[in-house]
Amino acid sequence: MKFLSARDFHPVAFLGLMLVTTTAFPTSQVRRGDFTEDTTPNRPVYTTSQVGGLITHVLWEIVEMRKELCNGNSDCMNNDDALAENNLKLPEIQRNDGCYQTGYNQEICLLKISSGLLEYHSYLEYMKNNLKDNKKDKARVLQRDTETLIHIFNQEVKDLHKIVLPTPISNALLTDKLESQKEWLRTKTIQFILKSLEEFLKVTLRSTRQT
């Protein structure tokens, strides 16, 4: 998967990439036009290294948030109790999604990445709404940077209508399920969301390096 440009990028371009969509996306509801339509005549083009740099930065944000939520406890970092407690099924990239070296298919992989990141939107919204103070601020930044990645990957998809969007009904059911959790389980759930997104982005990062 290559993100090619006909021009060289200035070192500060990465900062521009981080800021390009800070106000472009909603924070409460996913609509097709919000994420899959780009009417800008000269939309920015990103290099593979830029996209990889942003993914790496988001991964760092995730790890730092997980450490803070766990107070640096390694057992907490590796605990999957939240999965057993609430049976969450978060987006993950499987072998047949075209993102691995064996059986790599760029278009199928791009569709999976875009659809998966869109599905994470409700989880990140839940996380932001259930954290306080500086943790809420960090969750807001993570959500914004993830939306920037959605914007970038959507630019590479040939047929935007093939991107799978969560339906309003499924979003509402998921929100009700998450918000109905007991208070003591919410931190575990947030940890699991972060861990799942981390794994999703690790595979995404490797896929951007495929030829």
UniProtKB/Swiss-Prot annotation:
Record has Secreted as a keyword: yes
**What gene is this protein translated from?**
Il6
Cystine links in this protein are 70-76, 99-109
Q: What is this protein called?
A: Interleukin-6
Q: Where does it localize?
A: Secreted
GO molecular function per UniProt: cytokine activity; growth factor activity; interleukin-6 receptor binding
Its primary localisation, in coarse terms, equals: secreted
InterPro entries per record:
4_helix_cytokine-like_core (IPR009079), IL-6-like (IPR003574), IL-6/GCSF/MGF (IPR030474), IL6/GCSF/MGF_CS (IPR030473)
